[in-house]
Curated annotation (Swiss-Prot):
Entries under PROSITE patterns matching the protein: RIBOSOMAL_L9 (PS00651)
Lipoprotein is among the record's keywords: no
Alphabetized HAMAP family for the sequence: Ribosomal_bL9
Gene Ontology terms: biological process: translation
Gene: rplI
Bias-annotated ranges (Basic and acidic residues): 156-166
GO MF annotation: an example: structural constituent of ribosome
UniProt GO cellular component terms: ribonucleoprotein complex; ribosome
Source organism phylogeny: Bacteria, Pseudomonadati, Pseudomonadota, Alphaproteobacteria, Hyphomicrobiales
Family the entry assigns: Belongs to the bacterial ribosomal protein bL9 family.
Region (Disordered): 156-198
Xref: Pfam families: Ribosomal_L9_C (PF03948), Ribosomal_L9_N (PF01281)
Name used for this protein in its record: Large ribosomal subunit protein bL9
Keywords: Ribonucleoprotein, Ribosomal protein, RNA-binding, rRNA-binding
Primary role: Binds to the 23S rRNA.
Length: 198
């Protein structure tokens, strides 16, 4: 089915373009949401009359979207979740979780605007795109952590794959092993024993 796009649709086309889409996509998504018209001769003439009004509305919507984008561009959102020692979450962080964090900060975002291919299932800092308008897209970072302290460590860029206590213990064990297996220290001890035997 051929349709005339009334606004920019991602991965499909720009406003005013005539594109061929599957019937179900047109009937269930594009036409009911007012994103397109069937590409008949009457609708083509209707679009030409509506073109100036549609472009003016698009410019207004884009200006509002730019204001929202300036508020959230580069923002870091912290989501606390339970996770295993290896950093795998017991569950996942979904679009709904991200939206609730922005709503708590006073920014309204629709589910369809968050471009998340798959749920986040690991601890760390993840970059996520948000399309506040078909022509305006921003990137935000989502920090997933077990606690607020761990979130701060992640944001500072520290490695959280092991606990700090474990890292300190490993460093001490390595230093002790270095002293124990130091070949020069071992030879000095043998020379002292040989001198004592004589």
């Amino acid at each position: 089915m051929e349709v005339i796009l009334l606004e920019r649709v991602a991965k499909l086309g720009q406003m005013g373009e005539v594109v061929k889409v599957k019937h179900g996509f047109a009937r269930n998504f594009l036409l009911p949401r007012g994103k397109a018209l069937r590409a008949t001769t009457d609708n083509r003439a209707k679009y030409e009359h509506m073109k100036a009004d549609l472009e003016a509305r698009n410019i207004e919507a884009k200006a509002e979207a730019i204001k929202v984008a300036e508020k959230i561009d580069g923002r870091n959102v912290v989501v606390l979740r339970q996770a295993s020692e290896t950093g795998q979450l017991f569950g996942s962080v979904t679009v709904r979780d991200i939206i609730s964090q922005f709503t708590a900060d006073g920014v309204h975002i629709e589910r369809s605007q968050v471009l998340l291919d798959h749920p986040v299932k690991t601890i760390g800092k993840h970059s996520i795109s948000i399309a506040v308008h078909p022509e305006v897209e921003v990137s935000v970072s989502v920090t997933v952590a077990r606690s607020a302290l761990e979130a701060e460590r992640i944001n500072r860029g520290e490695d959280i794959s092991t606990r700090q206590e474990d890292q300190d213990a490993a460093a001490e064990a390595l230093a002790a092993a270095g002293e124990f297996f130091d070949p020069e220290a071992h030879n000095d001890g043998e020379q002292e024993e040989e001198a004592g035997d004589k």
